[in-house]
Amino acid sequence: MRIALRLGAIAAACLWAAACARPSISDVGDAKTGAALIGQAQCGACHAIPGIAAADGLSGPPLKGFAQRSIIAGMLANTPSNLVAWLRDPQKIVPGNAMPDTHLSDAQAQDVAAYLYTLR
């Protein structure tokens, strides 16, 4: 019983540490390209996004301070791999959510993620 409790505590600590780790922007993609893609995909129709012209949407969460968030999509640790997966196919991650299919390639999603990680 004690071993199970300790293992559970260790697992919880590892998940917490992973969620709190902040990725290096250079490890994700190109932030400048990501900003352009965000504009093209009209993400600002739903989200308020600092640094993106006319990105003042109110139906999605505002993305100011995105890099400081520990959780994305209400349930995922804020890691580059989780963010890229979410950007590529949000319905696969959380079926029925309001985020539309972005039609981003893996490389494009990495670039968008790089931009989002500049938002502190």
Give the ranges of each region predicted by the language model.
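Detector for the c-type heme attachment site
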Residues: 21-25, 46-53, 68, 88
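Sec-dependent bacterial lipoprotein signal peptides
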Residues: 1-20
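Short, solvent-exposed mixed-charge patches
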Residues: 119-120
